[in-house]
Structure formats: structure tokens, C-alpha cells
Amino acid sequence: MSDQPADKSANKPDLAAMRRDYTLAALDESAVARDPFTQFECWLDEAINGGCAEPNAMSLATVDGSGAAARPSARIVLLKGVEAGGEAGGLVFFTNYESRKGRELAANPHAALLFYWIEMEREVRIEGRVEKIDAAESDAYYATRPVKARLGAWASPQSQAISSREWLERRMMDADARYGASPPRPPEWGGYRLIPASFEFWQGRADRLHDRIAYARGAQAWMIRRLAP
């Protein structure tokens, strides 16, 4: 019997061969809404009603500064509001202002969002400037969260290194003992609004000839164009 370890590579999936064809729908610039917020809300509704898993989940990309030395980072957050129309219309999410993303947004307020609805063979990319929402708006949303989630906002010094899971659980118990069923909103926790400068709607198509329709904010109206896949 050989003493050589078994070759596990034979059981590994062939990543280079993994692919799927996209055939569910098409996207034409003559048929999209003139306002990208309208188009986005239409697709979001279809993702919700179409059974997509966590349709409001989005990747948020930020950078820690500007210039060649800036480093990007990304994570999944949840969309909690769409404020359509006007110069200040935007997409709202909540987090800890002292987390890595919060610190990066303080250093550079430009960010990108990505929604990927694989069940619909669709993707939406949104880029723009991020600002904090009013404290009253953050208070109102925070009050709707489950009590444990509100206590967790007090317990977790998000993005900081901690000694153990037990340390975090003790912090949770301390927050529960202090605030009980009525924890106030921590001052370092609240909402942001991304004000879009551009949208891109991607619809998967056969043979990798995907449809890409981009919107860019103009002086008077949104400009619409098709991009090569």
C-alpha cells in the first residue's frame, strides 16, 4: 500500500468549466423607464415577488482614502429605503459609524452598491456620494428593530478586534441588564443615504451578449446609453 496521500484534486470542482447560459429576459433601452429610480424599484419589486433570496441585500464598496494608495473594501449590507426623485433622492442603509465602512465613508464619501439577483439573471450597479441621514430618521428606524438587534448595536464595537466570543456575549448581557426592553440608539449607530450619480442595469443574455443599460446624471435629466457586455 502506498504511503503517498490521496490526490484530492480529482474531487475538486473544475472552476474554469463552470458557467451557465442566461435566457430569462432581455433589456432594451427603448423600453426602460426614463428615471432610473423608477426602473430600479420595478426590478426590486420583481425580485421580491419573484422569490429572490434577500432581494434587498447589496454589496457596499468603499475606499479608505484617495489616490493610488487607497485600498478598497466591500461587504454585504441591507437596503432599508428608496427615496426616489429630486437631487437628494437616494438609497438608505444603516450601520455603525465607527466600523471600517463608516471610517472609510468619513474619509471618502464616494461608494458603490451592487445588487445581484441570480434568480432573475439581473444585476444593478449604483455609484454615488454618501451622506448621513438625520438623527430623527435613524431613531425612527432603530425603534423598529428587534430588541436583541438593538442591544447588539450596543454590545458590538464593530470592526474592532475582540478577545473572544465570550467577551462579546458578556457585553450583550451587560447591555441587556442596563437597557432591558428599551435600548436607545447608540450615538455611533445610524443611517446613510447614497445619492446616485449613475446606475447600470445588467440583464444576462445568451452567448455572453448581455444587455447593459447605463444612466448618468445630467444637468437637467438622466442620460441613458447601452454599454457593450
Question: Model-derived features: where do they sit?
Answer:
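Binding-site signature for planar aromatic cofactors or substrates
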Residues: 1-229
